[in-house]
């Protein structure tokens, strides 16, 4: 799965640029995955909780994603790619929240060990992003299409080897998910997650283009993406200790503030390679510790039969709504204000998320 992400996220925008699409068109196409995340994870999560089985749905989603993706080989028109990517994203974006639920279901009370499982996804990302970086410097960008196809075939095969966890009943099972969502702690978490994903909109849409435009080779681009994920792996390994030292909520607040610093560094210091490297190391916080703490907090708030819906809601609000908003804003800002200002604006979303989380969190809820 994350080898696919390591192939698609850094390089797909370069493929779209090679087809002659404008910056805003690229932003729209890249945002389709976030658009689908607004409703698809919650829909499939509801179905999984209703049926009481997650793994068969994961298998169906993997198969339907594979069939949808084949459409990219048939035409390169903007309207066709729009339709294909929207259909693909509807199936693909729903699988990760279900996998998160399955993983946390197997871990039980040992949720602080989540990072040790998730780091294997990061390793897959690194191998894909570095390998393709070198290959795309040598071969035509269309090689990317076949590499992504290989990743999706592998996901489909491995989905049939995932064990189904036992769903543990909880006293909140009889309650409504709306009652959980209206809790101030949950609202604070969702607001913060929306802002963090909005901050990353420009990063996931234009970062590779931004680096190439400033003279970095595709191999260098691959290594920079990989460096961020290596830092992410290290933070995943340290999360059990960090959680005991600081708690999940403090980790989330710190991660949001670091996003403000990171995207300003990328925006204003792209020509200083050592600053770019340092900014990528900060991915450990802006994704690694942020995501691990957000997933764990979601798992704490949504129990029993609400677990899949909870993870789906987290994905919908953050990567769906927040990612779509951030991606579309970045597409407009890129053409209106330029690349550096776009990254600086994105940093403000991280700062706003930090302030919102602290402001909305109930006084009795210890940070």
Report the location of each language-model feature.
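Symmetry-related core transmembrane helices of the 12-TM Major Facilitator Superfamily/SLC fold
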Residues: 143-160, 342-359
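Helix-loop boundary and gating motifs at the non-cytosolic
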Residues: 1-34, 186-192, 197-224
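Helix-loop junctions at membrane interfaces in 12-TM secondary transporters
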Residues: 73-85, 267-279
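Structural signature of the two symmetry-related core transmembrane helices
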Residues: 56-70, 250-265
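Juxtamembrane intracellular "pre-TM" segments in multi-pass secondary transporters
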Residues: 159-193
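Helix-to-loop junctions at the C-terminal end of transmembrane segments
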Residues: 39-53, 136-137, 234-248, 334-335
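Interfacial helix-cap and linker-helix signal at transmembrane-aqueous boundaries
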Residues: 16-17, 47-48, 119, 134-139, ...
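Cytoplasmic helix-loop-helix junction between adjacent transmembrane helices
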Residues: 86-120
């Amino acid at each position: 799965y994350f080898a696919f992400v390591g192939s698609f996220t850094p390089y797909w925008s370069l493929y779209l640029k090679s087809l002659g699409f404008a910056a805003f068109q690229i932003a729209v196409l890249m945002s389709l995955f976030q658009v689908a995340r607004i409703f698809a994870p919650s829909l499939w999560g509801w179905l999984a909780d209703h049926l009481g089985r997650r793994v068969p749905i994961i298998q169906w989603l993997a198969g339907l994603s594979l069939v949808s993706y084949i459409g990219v080989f048939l035409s390169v028109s903007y309207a066709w790619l729009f339709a294909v990517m929207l259909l693909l994203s509807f199936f693909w974006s729903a699988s990760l929240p279900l996998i998160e639920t399955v993983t946390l279901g197997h871990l039980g009370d040992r949720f602080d060990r989540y990072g040790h499982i998730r780091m294997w996804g990061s390793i897959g990302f690194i191998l894909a992003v570095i390998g393709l970086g070198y290959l795309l410097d040598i071969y035509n960008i269309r090689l990317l299409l076949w590499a992504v196809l290989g990743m999706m075939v592998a996901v489909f095969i491995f989905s049939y080897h995932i064990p189904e966890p036992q769903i543990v009943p909880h006293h909140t099972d009889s309650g409504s998910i709306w009652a959980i969502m209206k809790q101030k702690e949950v609202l604070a978490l969702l607001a913060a997650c929306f802002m963090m994903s909005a901050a990353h909109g420009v990063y996931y849409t234009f970062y590779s283009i931004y680096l190439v435009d400033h003279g970095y080779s595709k191999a260098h681009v691959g290594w920079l993406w990989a460096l961020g994920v290596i830092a992410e792996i290290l933070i995943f390994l340290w999360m059990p200790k960090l959680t005991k030292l600081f708690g999940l909520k403090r980790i989330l607040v710190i991660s949001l503030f670091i996003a403000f610093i990171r995207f300003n560094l990328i925006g204003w210091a792209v020509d200083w390679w050592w600053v770019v490297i340092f900014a990528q190391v900060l991915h450990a916080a802006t994704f690694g510790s942020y995501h691990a703490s957000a997933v764990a907090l979601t798992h704490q708030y949504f129990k029993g039969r609400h677990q899949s819906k909870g993870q789906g809601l987290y994905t919908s609000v953050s990567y769906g709504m927040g990612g779509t908003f951030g991606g579309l804003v970045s597409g407009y800002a890129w053409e209106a204000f330029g690349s550096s200002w776009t990254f600086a604006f994105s940093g403000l979303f991280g700062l706003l998320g930090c302030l919102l989380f602290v402001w909305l969190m109930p006084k009795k809820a210890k940070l």
